[in-house]
Swiss-Prot record:
Belongs to the bacterial ribosomal protein bS18 family. GO terms for molecular function: small ribosomal subunit rRNA binding; structural constituent of ribosome. This is Small ribosomal subunit protein bS18. Part of the 30S ribosomal subunit. Forms a tight heterodimer with protein bS6. Keywords: Ribonucleoprotein, Ribosomal protein, RNA-binding, rRNA-binding.
Length: 78
């Protein structure tokens, strides 16, 4: 009976920020933009949370990894 009383919320589809801005590439040197897609522990946010499309999520992941490699972003946050 309790199951019938619960109402399901319809999840709103998140729009890819990079597709909406028509930005051509994601720059690994733009640390402020990349920090939005990293958790407080230093993990990269998944697609279902960030709302990015698959193409831009792959580019974002590569940019974050490049930025970490040259020490613009930390691997872990303390």
């Amino acid at each position: 009976m309790m199951e019938n009383n619960k109402r399901k919320r319809k999840a709103r589809k998140k729009i890819c920020v990079f597709c909406a801005d028509k930005s051509k590439n994601i720059d690994y040197k733009d640390v402020h933009k990349l920090k939005k897609y990293i958790t407080e522990r230093g993990k990269i946010l998944p697609r279902r949370i960030s709302g990015n499309c698959a193409i831009h999520q792959r580019e974002l992941t590569q940019a974050i990894k490049r930025s970490r490699h040259i020490a613009l972003l930390p691997y872990t946050m303390d």
